[in-house]
Regions:
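Conserved N-terminal subdomain of the carbohydrate kinase-like
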Residues: 1-6, 18-109, 253-257
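C-terminal binding/interaction regions
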Residues: 354-433
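Phosphate-handling active-site elements
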Residues: 28-33, 191, 216-230
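Short pre-catalytic strand/loop immediately N-terminal to key active-site residues, enriched for Gly-Thr
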Residues: 7-13, 190-203
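Conserved phosphate/ATP/ADP-binding segment of small-molecule kinases
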Residues: 116-190
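Charged C-terminal helix
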Residues: 52, 225-281, 286-292
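Extended, low-hydrophobicity segments enriched in charged/polar residues
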Residues: 261-372
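Short, small-residue alpha-helix embedded
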Residues: 19-24, 141-142, 200-223
Length: 433
């Protein structure tokens, strides 16, 4: 079985560290080996004590694991001291598997998880061996030696950290203000990953991200694919976070979504939609119903009909099975909406008639609109239009409509938390028309 390794501290509360890493490995489907560097007494409110294991014991654990298991990728977390960094770097010398370094320095609850010489030791001894480094804003400051207050600062810091020898740098955006943007610097170019910012602190998010990326690398994914899939898993963990103690919530690092249930919900919903949608409301391009995974970040995370709901004689019929990645139109609307409200994971498209504008508002639906003729050249209509409607209204609307354009039908998209929610809105709109 494919095997991943985590070298990190033990969290007695189970929300971060070794415990979170192993849950993340298992959720992806790889076996997890662990090397414990420190034992911490902590919970969701505080870190009460840190006991670093003797360096010889850390080395013994590394030898035991590396001498027996074919490691596919490794991740380091809380290393705490220069001595432990040196031992880990020496043990990993010459290894051929990818190494992800999460330069843990401070806990979510604010406690320091390092000695003074940690950052220098990481820079000299471990980062040159790393395929990916995943610092947050404060860790990026320590490793780069410069203040990081903006995305522009993060770009400079990422270049500096990369110059220490790291193959790639992912500066996490959780500690910046404004829109959540993770910044990747890899092979001389930057990639920005944008997603919804949850208005709360969550325990274990950094561990879950690094471990998920490591698990996907172990499974054979290229680095960029592993990062994208890892971010999606963490977004799903945020969406399903839970409270176990009396302090901060815990990221659900072992979340496993019922993909079959989502497929079934789309197919069942499509059958209902074919019965309740009048022919006059059906666009020439057909109707599609989409439903995204929690925390979805890509088209592959959205399930929709392959063949849409189309007119067959004097009735509508759902054609083709539901499949993840089957839609572009509806999927882009859902993904854009989820960046602003991750609860809204489903949408359907219907023909729009201008006379419905007043009726929709009287029925209490929030209506957002956009004008296709104002779309910038090269933009994706559905992403740009959805974002325009959201920004103009100040929140995600129930219905997003446009009047069409040359060769384009006037269309409205009804959004909801799940297909059943969307179809409840469709019923109300149709009956009130």
């Amino acid at each position: 079985m494919r095997t991943a390794l985590t070298v990190a501290g033990s969290d007695s509360g189970g929300g971060a560290g070794i415990q979170a890493d192993l849950k993340s490995f298992a959720a992806v489907g790889v076996h997890g080996c662990s090397v414990i560097t420190c034992v911490t007494a902590q919970n969701t409110r505080s870190v009460d004590s840190i006991f670093p294991l003797p360096v010889d014991e850390v080395t013994a654990q590394l030898r035991a694991v590396l001498s027996d298991f074919a490691i596919g990728a490794a991740k380091t977390g809380m290393l705490y001291s220069a001595e432990i960094v040196r031992a880990v770097a020496d043990a990993l010398e010459g290894s051929r598997f990818p190494i992800v370094v999460d330069p843990v320095m401070v806990a979510t609850v604010g406690a320091s998880l390092e000695t003074r010489d940690l950052a220098a030791a990481l820079s000299r001894q471990l980062l040159p061996r790393a395929d990916l480094v995943t610092p947050n804003r404060y860790e990026a400051e320590r490793l780069s030696g410069r203040r990081v207050r903006s995305l522009a600062d993060a770009r400079i810091a990422a270049r500096r950290i990369s110059s220490l020898g790291a193959g790639a740098v992912l500066v996490k955006g959780g500690h910046f203000r404004g829109e959540l943007v993770d910044l990747l610097y890899h092979e001389g170019r930057f990639t920005e990953y944008r997603s919804y910012r949850y208005p709360k602190e969550l325990h274990g998010s950094g561990c879950a991200l690094g471990a998920s990326i490591t698990a996907f690398l172990t499974a054979g994914d290229p680095l960029r694919v592993a990062i994208e899939r890892g971010r999606q898993r963490v977004a799903m963990g945020f969406a399903t976070a839970y409270r176990a103690g009396h302090g901060v919530e815990i990221v659900n690092s072992h979340a496993i979504v019922d993909r079959h249930g989502i497929v079934r919900a789309v197919e069942d919903g499509a059958a209902v939609a074919a019965r309740i949608i009048p022919l006059a409301w059906t666009p020439e391009v057909g109707v599609n119903l989409g439903y995204a995974l929690p925390g979805a970040t890509s088209l592959a995370d959205v399930c929709a009909l392959e063949g849409r709901i189309i007119r067959v004689g004097e009735r509508l019929q759902a054609t083709g099975p539901a499949r993840f990645g089957a839609s572009r139109h509806v999927a882009r609307i859902i993904l854009t909406a989820m960046r602003y409200d991750p609860r809204l994971r489903s949408a359907i498209n219907l023909k729009y008639r201008e006379k419905n504008r007043t009726r929709l508002k009287k029925m209490g639906f929030a209506l957002g609109t956009f004008a296709r003729e104002r779309e910038p050249r090269g933009a994706s209509t559905m992403e740009w239009g959805t974002e325009q409607a959201i920004r103009r209204l100040g929140r995600v609307p129930d219905v997003i409509a446009d009047r069409g354009g040359v060769g384009k039908e006037a269309m409205m998209r009804i959004l909801g938390e799940e297909p059943a929610d969307v179809l409840r809105k469709v019923r109300r709109i149709v009956r009130g028309a």
